[in-house]
Amino acid sequence: PTSFAAIEAAIDKLHNPPSMYGFVAPNKVDENFMSQVLEHVFLANGLSPVGSDGFASLDKQKTVEVLDFYKKIATASPPGELFWKQSREVYFAGKAAMIIWSPFILDELAGLRDSAPPTINDDPTSTELASKTGIVTTFGGPSNPSGAAWADIRYFGVTSDANTDVATQFVEYSMKDGYTATLSIAPEGKFPVRRGEVTDTAKYIKAWSKLPVGVDRKAPLS
């Protein structure tokens, strides 16, 4: 489902606790994970506190739509305090129909990490849950049908007291000849902001898509 309405309809169809919860949404307000998920829901409905002139006030109707939707998915979630760990565990046990999580979940979902295995069956290396999981990268609310994704861009910073010549060489290497190696550090959680070079505009996209992921076992990203 790629819209608030479609997700709500799926919850109405699939929510059957305690054997199956329609959703597992974070509710632990002092965890950054909930902030990220809630921000994604705000963006999905076309809301951001940042405007061209700095701070932008939130539209009341759009905000109410966001909060009503979040209340719906939170109500369809298991009881108790939920953040990244619990939400992943509930989904991996096959007890939740839907979850909002970062792509860092992908290698674990595929049974490639022993410390966070799928528990939907007795085989911690099983790809059964992965085969039954669909990935949605963007979704939209009633005030923003085109939807939005959530991401953060990572930057290199060079301090004023650093060896700036050496640091500059490292940054240049990391963003060019070493860019694929940079992406190879947990590639399931990254997406290349540099898609390629002039001579091959998809060079880094293609290289990234084939990088191995996993902790205790490896598999190609695609």
Predicted regions and their residues:
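Paired acidic/hydrophobic, glycine-rich loop segments that form the ligand-binding mouth/hinge
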Residues: 22, 97-102, 108-109, 117-120
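C-terminal lobe and pocket-closing loops
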Residues: 108-117, 121, 126-128, 141-222
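Short helix-loop capping/hinge motifs at secondary-structure junctions, enriched
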Residues: 1, 48, 76, 161-167
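Glycine-centered hinge/linker elements that transmit conformational signals in sensory
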Residues: 8-13, 17, 52-81, 124, ...
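Short helix-initiation/N-cap motifs at beta->coil->alpha
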Residues: 2-8, 79-93
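Non-transmembrane alpha-helical segments in soluble domains
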Residues: 8-15, 39, 67-74, 88, ...
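Structural recognition of the beta-strand scaffold that forms the well-ordered cores
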Residues: 22-25, 97-101, 134-137, 156-158
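Extracytoplasmic/periplasmic solute-binding protein
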Residues: 5-55, 96
